Amino acid sequence: MKLKISFLPTFLIFLISLDSVTAQEICFSGFFKPNSTYDLNRRQILSTLSSNVTSHNGFFNSKFGQAPNRVFINGMCIPGTKPETCSDCIKGASDKISESCPNKTDAYTWPDCCMVRYSNVSFSGSLVMEPSETLYHTGDIEDTGTNLTVFDRIWEELMLRTITAASLSSSNGSSFGQKYFAAEVASLTTFQTMYAMMQCTPDVSSKDCEFCLKTSVGDYESCCRGKQGGAVIRPSCFVRWDLYPYAGAFENVTFPPPPPQSLPQPPVSLIPPPVSDRANTTIKGIIVAIVVPIIVILVSLVVLLVVCRRKKSYKTTEVQATDEITTTHSLQFSFKTIEAATDKFSDSNMIGRGGFGEVYRGKLSSGPEVAVKRLSKTSGQGAEEFKNEAVLVSKLQHKNLVRLLGFCLEGEEKILVYEFVPNKSLDYFLFDPAKQGELDWTRRYNIIGGIARGILYLHQDSRLTIIHRDLKASNILLDADMNPKIADFGMARIFGVDQSQANTRRIAGTFGYMSPEYAMRGHFSMKSDVYSFGVLVLEIISGKKNSSFYNIDDSGSNLVTHAWRLWRNGSPLELVDPTIGESYQSSEATRCIHIALLCVQEDPADRPLLPAIIMMLTSSTTTLHVPRAPGFCLSGRDLEQDGVEYTESTSRSIPGSINDASITEFYPR
């Protein structure tokens, strides 16, 4: 009976706060006309998918029809699913995805025990990370009475264990057995267990599976830490954890023993005390029975606190030790591998050039395309910038940050290998009159939100506090779906746990994006990145470079001051890029301009931090402060007269290049 009473409050909390983590149908990419050839092919292959999956040991990958109306499809169930359950899940998912995505060429869904995906392009064997969806319970873990520090430790251990088990697993030959699946459990308390399930599509590599799962866990942690459960779904992988078993995935899992209890009390003496002392002894016994457990608990908490602090201290030391990147063997490529990928650094593969070297497009023997940043042997700052970027970016995992795949350090060769981002950089579209039309308001608004989430990760949600110091349009890459990825961490700096700002005499960055306190005094902080973000938002909305306003008149105007004048005159929407037309929400655009003006306030204390910015962008009910006049920037010449060593960063690219932002050039003014 005690067991039932102890479990009941937690169970009731789930009934009250559960926000379903059942995966939604994700529709994306292009459109097709109803009853077109593609639509008929899609319906046909979806109608037979359930029987094909059950007859192919739980995984079916096929195509149907002729190009350009060919449909590619995946269907799979979790290992151990009964054939009838698998069939029902696939059929239900196929029907739901067909209804929810009536005219989209690409879609996928991950219900509890199966997955369905279709597309008009082949995706077999390819790691596909986006679009993704994060779901979570609305209840907080602290509502269950669980200590959050203890929970975090157990949760992280469970996630790492499940990632390892899933990415290294292979088919065991059992019914519907598949590789890249794991279901693990961990005891949170005597009466409470955590359940984690992860799965990748079996057509990707083990390394890609591990990356997909780690990224998903990182995304959940950034979004929903402290919640009572949740899931992250991607086209190539699925992560879910909860405080109760689900999907029938844990029937054969061995449950771990409960966490150790308090130390036992000392044995009671069997020799009876004298009769005259029995009353006193009884009182003493009661006191001992109460005090000893309290002391044990307090000592345990103190030990736990000390261990946690030592652990944090150790992690900080370990991070600084990684400055010697030759120890990072898991990320290292051989020079021969890079040469082969780029056809010996052929000019035809060069996609960018700058003061620190060149950027090449390459293709690894394992399949994926990469962007290879080869630092110049004669660059005086090359080694330091290389170390900085390699150490920083290798630790960053977020969908709005460019992904570092590895590096090469052999002799004088210093090379960084990044994921290949096909749609060039934001400035390529934003400032080209012929390309601006491709950025409608919806895309621009999504780009603003994605950049904000990427900066939030750098400032708060990653294990390091990182100040980018060079946020600008040419350092924002756009993937195939025009999602933004922050790039170029050559100037980034790590802050300590309690550090809020730092100073430098060498001002490095891009004029126009620098905050006044950084440009004039060398002070940089999270608020200086916020200033750069504000300028970037104004550029995205207007389609104009901040620098394009210089020398127009003698007023010293720039985009920031121009936006402020329009705001003050009650006509902020005059800032909106005319190529957008009328297809935007005026309230949404006005709100974004308002947020940008708050970000470029002269006093750093008046600028919002990223959590507040995200809230402002996503909630129309959040009240915004009235902006004051923004900070005014001096020219580079003025800075030199003030005795500040000033270095501006610019980007140069080969005409027709794929990736303008992969290299940054620095030169003295």
Swiss-Prot record:
Organism of provenance: Arabidopsis thaliana
Extracellular topological intervals: 24-285
GO molecular function terms listed in the Swiss-Prot or TrEMBL record: ATP binding; protein serine kinase activity; protein serine/threonine kinase activity
Lineage: Eukaryota, Viridiplantae, Streptophyta, Embryophyta, Tracheophyta
Tree of life domain: Eukaryota
Membrane topology category: Single-pass membrane protein
Residues bearing the modification Phosphotyrosine: 418, 518
Main localization category: membrane
Positions bearing Phosphoserine: 474
EC number: 2.7.11.1
GO CC terms in record: plasma membrane
SMART domains attached to this UniProt entry: S_TKc (SM00220)
Official protein name in the record: Cysteine-rich receptor-like protein kinase 34
